[in-house]
């Protein structure tokens, strides 16, 4: 199969929106603040007239990825699907914000490889696991401690922190501080 090109291309779509389509890939442990940051970033971008969309891992598991579990293979497929959807949205000229644990470097690198240079910003939300356990917004750490969640990232499954991300956010810093850092590299 060959990719079919159309007259209205990525450059024209981006120009119409007065922005460069790209993906902001937020990665970090469960409870690190990815979804909170994604929500605040989209709100800020919207207020500034930017066209954006959040692809939240939890929401995607209610539909597109509902058939996937949390084995390393399923996590790889989750990242692959989300990166392909994000690529289509970047092609439409959108700023796509993903909020996914995406624990394995190989999967994140594979995701990055499908984008053009400068279109993929890997952002590590660096929050100590102890803080994530205290936050535990979905009760997952409690379930993991009770033995109800095998393959739980950061506890019974490794999280491979990015070695050289485009940006590291301190998950214990203020939301405003983290959004300011993101806006600086996006707009």
Set out the residue ranges of the language-model regions.
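ATP-dependent NMP and nucleoside kinases share a basic, alpha-helical "lid"
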Residues: 63-70, 74, 84-144, 151
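Hydrophobic anchor at the beta1->P-loop junction of P-loop NTPases
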Residues: 26
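Conserved lysine of the Walker
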Residues: 34
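Phosphate-binding P-loop
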Residues: 14-21
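Short, small-residue-biased leader/transition segments that mark boundaries at the very start
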Residues: 1-2
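Conserved substrate/cofactor phosphate-moiety recognition/catalytic segment
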Residues: 39-87
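The conserved Walker
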Residues: 30
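Small-molecule kinase domains that catalyze NTP-dependent phosphoryl transfer to phosphate-bearing small molecules
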Residues: 126-129, 134-181
């Amino acid at each position: 199969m060959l990719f079919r090109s159309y007259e209205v291309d990525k450059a024209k779509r981006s120009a119409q929106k007065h922005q460069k389509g790209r993906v902001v890939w937020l990665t970090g442990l469960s409870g690190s603040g990815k979804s909170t940051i994604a929500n605040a970033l989209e709100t800020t971008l919207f207020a500034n007239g930017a066209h954006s969309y959040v692809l939240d891992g939890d929401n995607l598991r209610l539909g597109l990825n509902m058939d996937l579990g949390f084995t390393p293979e399923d996590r790889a497929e989750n990242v692959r699907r989300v990166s392909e959807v994000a690529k289509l949205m970047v092609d439409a000229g959108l700023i796509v914000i993903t909020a996914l644990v995406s624990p394995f470097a190989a999967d994140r690198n594979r995701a990055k490889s499908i984008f053009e240079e400068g279109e993929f910003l890997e952002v590590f939300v660096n929050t100590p696991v102890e803080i994530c356990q205290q936050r535990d917004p979905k009760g997952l750490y409690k379930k993991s401690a009770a033995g109800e969640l095998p393959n739980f990232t950061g506890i019974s499954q490794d999280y491979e922190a990015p070695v050289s991300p485009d940006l590291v956010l301190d998950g214990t810093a203020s939301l405003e501080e983290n959004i300011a850092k993101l806006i600086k590299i996006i707009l």
